[in-house]
Amino acid sequence: MSMMFLYEALRAAIDEEMGKDSNVFIVGEDVGHYGGSYKVTKDLHVKYGDLRVLDAPIAENSFTGMAIGAAMTGLRPIVEGMNMGFMLLAFNQISNNLSMLQYTSGGNFNIPVVIRGPGGIGKQLAAEHSQRLESCFQSIPGLQIVACSTAYNAKGLLKSAIIEKKPILFLEHVLLYNLKGFVPDEEYYLPLDKAEVVRSGSDVTIVTYSRMRYHVLAAVEKLVLNGQDPEIIDLISLKPLDLHTISKSIKKTHKIVIVEECAQTGGIAAELISLINTYLYDELDSPAVRLSSKDVPIPYNGNLEKSTLIQPDQIVDVVTNLLQYKT
């Protein structure tokens, strides 16, 4: 086992897959000589050359479209968005080409493209650099969405995404790049469609993903001191949702709280609650609860920014009240 930063685990995943398959290449703004905005691709251009670690102009629609065309010829592009908010400029390419071409070509083309890069609410990065776009992209048919949260799952998930035949949107939280964790020295892959049970418990199911995993863990420390026994599930796969793992937990706890960073309207929690009400309603002893960011642009001011996000103490209060709910 080696201790590494999350961004180093991502780099290791890309390096290993590029070393195994000459069809894998990465394209994006400053991915080459600069090494990427968060140094995920640092020095890869030295090892693999400027054609496989390709610096692109500031034109997300252009280099995303190029990557889709490259995938149609048999290559395996990794597209780095310098910031996920900028990938809105490629929304046409993602929604009308990337996700649909396998279907519209009658299965003649696979489109093995990974779109990855930093997103989420950072530290005073202001509105345009603090986009939470999982709720936008989840409505696109044919696009799978994965959110990493540890150095371990970042590497294993990205390696699996790179060898997939279908397009993957791979979400990396801007505040998790410097998170450290142990990563196995031997090669490994992780399933892209499975949630992780982070902590087993019997009182209530708390479902979360990405950075909010750590807000939930902080809240659970306090809940445990109060004699409560929550189960924590990290979704990892935001589309499709791993309803099997969630179902097993709900049938044990009969209560669920969903904690997310994306805005409440049309968020991941909204979709999950819809599925729970359809398939697991009779298993619940109380209504499903969601804790989401406020439906506002993210302020630059630090105090205002913090006020838009769900904080650990809010999770503690909601879970405590939920456990007192009487049917």
UniProtKB/Swiss-Prot annotation:
GO molecular function: metal ion binding; pyruvate dehydrogenase (acetyl-transferring) activity
Principal location class: plastid
Cofactors named for this entry: thiamine diphosphate
SUPFAM superfamilies membership: Thiamin diphosphate-binding fold (THDP-binding), TK C-terminal domain-like
Enzyme Commission code: 1.2.4.1
Catalyzed reaction equations: N(6)-[(R)-lipoyl]-L-lysyl-[protein] + pyruvate + H(+) = N(6)-[(R)-S(8)-acetyldihydrolipoyl]-L-lysyl-[protein] + CO2
One Pfam family of this chain: Transketolase_C
Binding site for thiamine diphosphate: 60
GO cellular component: chloroplast
Domain of life: Eukaryota
Location(s) in or outside the cell: Plastid, Chloroplast
Class of this enzyme: oxidoreductase
Keywords: Chloroplast, Metal-binding, Oxidoreductase, Plastid, Potassium, Pyruvate, Thiamine pyrophosphate
Binding-site positions, K(+): 113, 161-162, 164
Function noted in UniProt: The pyruvate dehydrogenase complex catalyzes the overall conversion of pyruvate to acetyl-CoA and CO(2). It contains multiple copies of three enzymatic components: pyruvate dehydrogenase (E1), dihydrolipoamide acetyltransferase (E2) and lipoamide dehydrogenase (E3).
Subunit (UniProt): Heterodimer of an alpha and a beta chain.
UniProt-recorded name of the protein: Pyruvate dehydrogenase E1 component subunit beta
Record organism: Cyanidium caldarium (Red alga)
Taxonomic lineage of the native organism: Eukaryota, Rhodophyta, Bangiophyceae, Cyanidiales, Cyanidiaceae
Name of the coding gene: pdhB
